[in-house]
């Protein structure tokens, strides 16, 4: 049963409001002042997507020349800068200049992290807020939590996490033509009635350049929900997936995007385009099945308690799904349960929780054809790892130094699905063991496809990991959804299978 309700009701108190600028000319005619509010764009059915991050800085890899070139085949491009500059032409070229600061200032903060995921960073942020700290969840390269620097730090350990940097210059965008350049101020709005190419790639019609927390810039695209999904589905589940699986993916990608639309509010946009959000690339060729799936589910999302759910999904669960609390250092959501993902007969053979390695080995050895999604290339996997490989990863993550050696590897805690939630790595340093928890296991040992594995010691410096699945294992398994669709399940049945007690709701967007 699908019901309707307005976005205003749905999001009352759910997503924080953030005004980008109250001096920003951004309607199609470029004549009216308009407040661009992240929350209001969502209510209108639009995402602000961070296409390219860290522009103008050391990590700017958008082009070799460190510039952005906007072109259009028809009509004109319009640029409006917050310092009053307006420009109209067939081509706009923006470069970056390091402008010296008259009064250099020292930036100081206390940094916690890195964290493997936004979810774990947000949980740390909440813990610090409960202690009275003002926090910011940021993503300079990895997820971090920042609190303001204080001379009188309440905990000694904080003194090891101080970040200091003197700001001598400011990265400034410059509008270039054949003869000169004009300094611009953000936000900068670039739009056209026709599609715009950026560095030779077709994107859309509405873009912003916005300064981020790190002194660099982000290229942001404003895009309708369904146009965004057309660039997500082909790269998340594949354009040739069965139609019902594509429909299920469309619903959860839309739901996930809405629920997580405050993920980058510190940098004044909603979502990124990498696996830290949902993989998005501009749609070059329209795929009929992808479009059918999006149109058939337009404005449909999954809700629980009249709010959108955090619709996690992944590649393969290896035959058993995880709870959110197994994957990240967060509280569980009631709509996620560990389930044996396959035929009903499997639930008679295997009972949850899977508490020990012997039971998990039996599970991994069982006939995989009875599970949904067993065709995935990593549904079952074996990985030999040496002490040297582990050591290299620990050094890279600054957990040990070059003189330390790895002696042993043990799982000390498992979740209800059998996934490792605590991994102890013993070293030759007296009383020195490294304990990796939940998503940090795969962040540090990133050669492990999932946390569903057993450990078998082959020699003093070699272990065999036997495992299943690819990804965190929470929510919909894309491989499972594809097989369920091939077996004749509808997208509603697929969603109900992976998100118990969640409701399919039809949202009503505010008028444009």
Locations of regions flagged by a protein language model:
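Conserved, single-site charged/polar hotspot
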Residues: 2-512
């Amino acid at each position: 049963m699908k019901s309707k309700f307005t976005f205003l009701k749905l999001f009352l108190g759910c997503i924080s409001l953030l005004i980008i600028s109250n001096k920003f000319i951004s309607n199609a005619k470029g004549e009216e002042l308009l407040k661009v509010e992240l929350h209001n764009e969502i209510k209108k059915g639009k995402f602000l997507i961070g296409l390219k991050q860290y522009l103008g800085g050391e990590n700017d890899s958008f082009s070799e020349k460190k510039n952005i070139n906007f072109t259009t085949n028809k009509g004109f491009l319009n640029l409006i800068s917050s310092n009053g500059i307006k420009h109209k032409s067939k081509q706009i070229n923006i470069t970056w200049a390091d402008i010296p600061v008259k009064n250099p200032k020292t930036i100081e903060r206390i940094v916690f992290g890195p964290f493997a995921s936004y979810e774990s960073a947000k949980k740390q942020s909440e813990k610090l807020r409960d202690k009275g700290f003002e926090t910011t969840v940021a993503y300079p390269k990895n997820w971090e939590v920042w609190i303001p620097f204080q001379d009188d730090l309440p905990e000694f350990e904080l003194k090891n996490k101080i970040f200091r940097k003197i700001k001598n210059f400011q990265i400034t965008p410059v509008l270039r033509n054949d003869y000169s350049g004009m300094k611009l101020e953000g936000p900068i709005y670039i739009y056209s009635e026709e599609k715009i190419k950026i560095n030779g790639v077709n994107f859309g019609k509405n873009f912003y350049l916005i300064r981020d927390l790190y002194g660099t810039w982000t290229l942001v695209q404003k895009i309708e929900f369904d146009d965004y999904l057309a660039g997500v589905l082909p790269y998340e589940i594949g354009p040739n997936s069965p139609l019902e699986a594509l429909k299920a993916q469309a619903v959860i990608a839309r739901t996930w995007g809405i629920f997580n639309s405050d993920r980058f509010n510190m940098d004044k946009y909603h979502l990124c385009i990498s696996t830290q959000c949902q993989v998005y690339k501009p749609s070059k060729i329209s795929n009929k099945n992808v479009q059918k799936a999006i149109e058939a589910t337009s404005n449909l999302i999954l809700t629980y308690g009249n709010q959108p759910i955090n619709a996690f999904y992944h590649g393969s669960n290896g035959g058993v799904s995880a709870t959110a609390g197994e994957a990240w250092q967060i509280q569980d959501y009631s709509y996620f349960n560990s389930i044996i993902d396959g035929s009903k007969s499997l639930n008679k053979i295997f009972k949850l929780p899977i508490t020990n390695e012997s039971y998990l080995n039996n599970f991994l050895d069982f006939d995989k054809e009875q599970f949904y999604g067993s065709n995935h290339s990593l549904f079952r996997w074996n990985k030999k790892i040496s002490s040297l490989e582990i050591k290299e990863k620990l050094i890279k993550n600054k957990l040990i130094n070059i003189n330390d050696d790895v002696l042993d590897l043990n799982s000390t805690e498992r979740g209800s699905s059998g996934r490792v939630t605590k991994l102890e790595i013993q070293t030759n340093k007296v009383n020195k063991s490294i304990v990796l928890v939940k998503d940090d296991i795969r962040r540090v040992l990133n050669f492990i496809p999932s946390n569903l594995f057993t450990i078998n010691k082959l020699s003093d410096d070699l272990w065999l990991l036997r495992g299943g699945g690819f990804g965190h294992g929470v929510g919909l398994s894309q491989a499972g959804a594809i097989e369920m669709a091939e077996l004749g399940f509808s997208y509603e049945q697929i969603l109900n299978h992976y998100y118990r007690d969640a409701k399919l709701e039809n949202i009503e967007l505010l008028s444009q």
